[in-house]
Swiss-Prot record:
Residues 142-161 are annotated as: Disordered. One of its GO terms (biological process) is cytochrome complex assembly. This is Cytochrome c-type biogenesis protein CcmE. The keyword Transferase does not apply. Its main location: membrane. It comes from Vibrio parahaemolyticus serotype O3:K6 (strain RIMD 2210633). It comes from the Bacteria. Keywords: Cell inner membrane, Cell membrane, Cytochrome c-type biogenesis, Heme, Iron, Membrane, Metal-binding, Signal-anchor, Transmembrane, Transmembrane helix. Residues 150-161 have a biased composition (Polar residues). Heme chaperone required for the biogenesis of c-type cytochromes. Transiently binds heme delivered by CcmC and transfers the heme to apo-cytochromes in a process facilitated by CcmF and CcmH. Heme binds at H129, Y133. GO terms for cellular component: plasma membrane. Belongs to the CcmE/CycJ family.
Amino acid sequence: MNPRRKKRLGIVLAIFIGISATIGLMLYALNQNMDLFYTPTELVNGKPDGTKPEVGQRLRIGGMVVVGSVRRDPNSLKVSFDLHDVGPKVTITYEGILPDLFREGQGIVAQGVLKDATTVEAFEVLAKHDEEYMPPEIAEAMKKTHEPLQYSSEQKQGSGE
């Protein structure tokens, strides 16, 4: 092999290794930043396909705030509350100001890190902003586990429909 071909081969190999390393690092970063959505039941029992989150994994969890479960620390902005759907309850801990629409019995989505099998340390809490609106992930999960609500004509009339 002449020196010119060796040099060209070295350049091509260096470019190939550089591109491969870049793609590998991008895939690693995307995998680390992926937040999977769970309901409280899926978090405790696992998803139907068998996946279950590991302690330390970032995730999103959605459900209804259990009435009477909100506990506030009087000396800080720390709040903890329980979430449920149709199964087990999951405790959410959060430090910060909760959204104005946050209430017991209301639907929320929390984004955070799984601390143990039934505790999530949230760094973001989002409250439902409309009676009719529900995030697509929660709507899909609720559709699987709940019967649709049937409203009487008086109830529909009272809601302005």
